[in-house]
C-alpha cells in the first residue's frame, strides 16, 4: 500500500515539470527521485525504532547461503521466473507508455497522470480483492491476475485501431491506455499480496524475512528484460518523429505501433499458462507425497 501511495504522489511531479522545461523533465525527475530517496533514508536512520529487538541480524555469508538455497529450490526458482513474465509487462509500461502516448497522441498527452492510474486503482482495490480471495489458495488468486495481464496489453493496443475519438477531448490512444492500465492494476491486486504469502510459506522458520527479500528478484529481472524489449520495440514500431523528414514518413513507419502491445500480450499469456501448469504440477507432487 505504501509503495503505491508513493508511486502515485511521485508521478504527480512529472507532467507539471515537463510543461515547464520540456523533455529535460525526464532527466531532472531522476534528481527528484534521488533527493526523495535520500530524505527517506535519513528519516529511517533518525526516526525509525524497531519494536522487536530480540535476535541478531544475518551475516553476509548467511545471506549468501540463503540465496543459494532459494536458487537451488526448483519450485521457488521457477515461480520467480514465471512471475518475472508478469512484471515484465508491468515494468515495461514505464519505458514504453510515455514515448508511445506522446508520439501517438501528441505532445499534450499526460503520461504522468496516465501512469498514476495504476497505483490509484491498487490503493483503492487491493484490500477488497485480498479479502475477497482470502478463502482461495494463493496460487488460485495469482492465476486470475496472470490471465488478466494479456487482456490489459490487448486493450492498450486497441487505441491505434479505433477510428474517431470515443470521448471528445481525449484521444483513443489515451483512453485505451487507461483501460489497459486499470486491468493491469487489478491483476497486480490479485497477484502481489498472495505471491508474497506463497513465498513466505516456503521459508524455514525464522528466515521468512530473508526469503521475502529474495522474492523480489523478479523486479530485477523484469526491469532489465522489460526495458530492453521496450526499447527495441519502440525503435521498430513507434520510432522518434525527429528521425523523419516529414510527418507522412513517420506515420508510415509507425502505422503498426500497436504491435508493441501484442508482444507483451504474448509474454503475459505464456507466463499465465506457465503458472497454471506450475500450480497443477506442484499440486500433483504434493498430493503424491501425502499419499
Task: Please state what every model-predicted region is.
Residues 147-169:
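C-terminal ends and interior cores of transmembrane alpha-helices
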Residues 1-2, 8, 14-94, 98-108, ...:
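Intracellular loop-helix junctions on the cytosolic face of multi-pass helical membrane proteins
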Residues 101, 189-204:
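Intracellular juxtamembrane helix-capping segments at the cytosolic ends
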Residues 18, 124-144:
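Helix-to-loop junctions at the C-terminal end of transmembrane segments
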Residues 1, 108-109, 174-175, 203-218:
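Loop-to-transmembrane helix entry/capping segments in MFS-fold secondary transporters
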Residues 166-191:
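Hydrophobic core of transmembrane alpha-helices in multi-pass small-molecule transporters
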Residues 1-18, 34-37, 115-119, 215-230:
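Glycine-rich segments within core transmembrane alpha-helices of 12-TM secondary carriers
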Residues 28, 99-123, 144, 171, ...:
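Loop-to-transmembrane helix entry
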Amino acid at each position: 500500500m505504501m509503495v503505491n501511495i508513493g508511486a502515485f504522489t511521485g508521478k504527480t511531479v512529472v507532467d507539471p515539470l515537463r510543461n515547464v522545461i520540456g523533455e529535460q523533465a525526464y532527466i531532472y525527475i531522476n534528481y527528484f527521485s534521488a533527493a526523495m530517496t535520500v530524505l527517506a533514508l535519513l528519516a529511517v536512520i533518525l526516526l525509525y525504532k524497531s519494536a522487536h529487538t530480540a535476535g541478531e541480524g544475518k551475516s553476509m555469508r548467511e545471506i549468501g547461503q540463503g540465496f543459494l538455497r532459494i536458487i537451488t529450490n526448483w519450485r521457488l526458482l521457477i515461480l520467480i521466473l514465471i512471475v518475472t513474465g508478469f512484471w515484465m509487462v508491468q515494468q515495461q509500461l514505464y519505458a514504453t507508455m510515455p514515448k508511445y502516448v506522446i508520439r501517438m497522441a501528441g505532445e499534450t498527452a499526460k503520461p504522468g497522470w496516465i501512469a498514476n492510474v495504476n497505483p490509484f486503482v491498487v490503493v483503492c482495490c487491493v484490500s477488497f480483492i485480498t479479502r475477497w480471495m482470502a478463502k482461495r489458495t494463493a496460487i488460485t488468486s495469482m492465476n486470475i491476475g496472470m490471465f488478466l495481464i494479456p487482456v490489459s496489453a490487448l486493450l492498450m493496443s486497441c487505441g491505434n485501431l479505433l477510428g474517431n475519438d470515443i470521448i471528445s477531448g481525449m484521444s483513443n490512444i489515451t483512453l485505451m491506455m487507461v483501460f489497459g492500465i486499470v486491468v493491469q492494476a487489478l491483476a497486480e491486486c490479485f497477484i502481489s499480496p498472495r505471491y508474497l504469502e506463497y513465498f513466505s510459506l516456503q521459508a524455514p522458520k525464522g528466515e521468512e524475512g530473508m526469503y521475502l527479500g529474495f522474492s523480489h528478484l523478479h523486479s530485477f529481472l523484469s526491469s532489465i528484460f522489460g526495458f530492453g524489449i521496450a526499447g527495441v520495440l519502440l525503435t521498430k514500431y513507434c520510432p522518434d518523429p525527429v528521425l523523419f523528414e516529414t510527418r507522412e514518413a513517420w506515420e508510415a513507419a509507425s502505422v503498426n505501433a500497436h504491435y508493441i502491445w501484442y508482444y507483451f500480450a504474448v509474454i503475459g499469456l505464456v507466463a499465465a499458462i506457465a503458472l497454471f501448469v506450475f500450480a497443477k504440477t506442484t499440486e500433483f507432487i504434493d498430493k503424491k507425497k501425502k499419499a
